[in-house]
Amino acid sequence: MTLMEDAKKGIVTPSIETVAKTEGIDPETVCSCVAKGLIAIPVNNRRETLPIGIGKYMSTKINANVGTSRDYVDIDAEIKKAKAAEAFGAHAVMDLSTGGNLDEIRTRILKSVNIPVGTVPIYQAAASRKVVVEMTSDDMFNAVRKHAEQGVDFVTVHAGVNLNSLERLRQSDRIMNVVSRGGSFTLAWMLHNGEDNPFYAEFDYLLEIAKEYDMTLSLGDGMRPGCIADASDRPKFMEFITLGELVKRARAANVQTFVEGPGHVPLNEIELSVRGMKELCNGAPLYLLGPLVTDIAPGFDHITGAIGGAVAGMHGTDFLCMVTPSEHLALPTLEDIKEGLLVTKVAAHTIDLIKEGPRERAWEKDLAMAYARRDLDWEKQFELAIDGNRARKIRDARKTESDTCSMCGELCALKIVKEAFEKKNSEE
């Protein structure tokens, strides 16, 4: 049985128990939400994975993308990135490799981390042919099965890209057409072959494979906007309607899903996007890249993505895909992965401060930091900081003889007021 089947029968599995304990929520609530598809716990039955909960009442989760490109194939470097991502707090990693021995890369990444691992099988299907459009539907489904057999916990499938959404795209005024790599493969394949997307046309077969391995489907946003001018157009929302229908079919088949969301969205349209996705996709957990809130910040898109992610979290986003400083520019380095992840952790924590479920635990951290700052307890501040080592290095770089920081020294507002009160109290 799949995890969702067990949950529908009220069976609290070890994975559900682990998630409940981690999140500080009673197991029955987690079980009920898994049964309804409101929480996803991506754990392939072929792999020992640290269970994480994504969705309602869960703390905001973060994914880190790693993997080779055809220009840069260094498997050891990608393994280091995956390990670093886990060490710095990522809850999942995705192997997006397109260059080199894809089977070897994926196998090594699966062995190198304990957290859930996701992939995009169509990349391997496309790599099996000289030209992307020459891959067959068998290539696509065989890739999904291979990844499932190897223990991949969740796969992105762009099943919402179909002939209907293609027509919406043709009739639209989009500037950037399709910026999703998997979406572009699918669209090009449909145009070349004159057929509908196999992942859509044969979605029931896809569900059979996923169910056999209890593998979660991440329903990809092949029509996501690539610039803020395209943020709220018909192709995007048409895909959400389709994805919502597929979510229902997956739940009926006892296959877990979450839904991927838009890339570039201005601040004032994020609520529309996120609430629209939640409504159209029947409350499924939402997995967002960003969204990036401006197009003019290459080199700083980890920041534009964190801004968008924090706002999206106010309206229902559950799972953030971190963005690195290299976004739109190059394959990210190890340092890019660390920087992007830490910035995304800041965004995730700001979401948890207001999210039902993790809110109380998140507030405890901020309150503890407030008391540590009030008391000028630097060691406690470093302990509580998202990146305590970085905080310590900054403070140590410009030391002061006082117990304050070098910005204010003896003019520290906290110290002045504290000493003033102490003096007044001693006189009374």
Curated annotation (Swiss-Prot):
Pathway: Cofactor biosynthesis; thiamine diphosphate biosynthesis. The gene is thiC2. The keyword Cell membrane does not apply. Catalyzes the synthesis of the hydroxymethylpyrimidine phosphate (HMP-P) moiety of thiamine from aminoimidazole ribotide (AIR) in a radical S-adenosyl-L-methionine (SAM)-dependent reaction. Zn(2+) binds at H264, H328. Its EC number is 4.1.99.17. GO terms for molecular function: 4 iron, 4 sulfur cluster binding; carbon-carbon lyase activity; zinc ion binding. The keyword Zinc applies. It catalyses: 5-amino-1-(5-phospho-beta-D-ribosyl)imidazole + S-adenosyl-L-methionine = 4-amino-2-methyl-5-(phosphooxymethyl)pyrimidine + CO + 5'-deoxyadenosine + formate + L-methionine + 3 H(+). Belongs to the ThiC family. Keywords: 4Fe-4S, Iron, Iron-sulfur, Lyase, Metal-binding, S-adenosyl-L-methionine, Thiamine biosynthesis, Zinc. Its cofactor is [4Fe-4S] cluster. It holds the Pfam family ThiC_Rad_SAM. [4Fe-4S] cluster binds at C405, C408, C412. Substrate binds at N65, M94, Y123, H158, S180, R181, G182, D221, G222, M223, R224, E260, Y287. This is Phosphomethylpyrimidine synthase 2. Binds 1 [4Fe-4S] cluster per subunit. The cluster is coordinated with 3 cysteines and an exchangeable S-adenosyl-L-methionine. GO terms for biological process: thiamine biosynthetic process; thiamine diphosphate biosynthetic process. It comes from Methanosarcina barkeri (strain Fusaro / DSM 804).
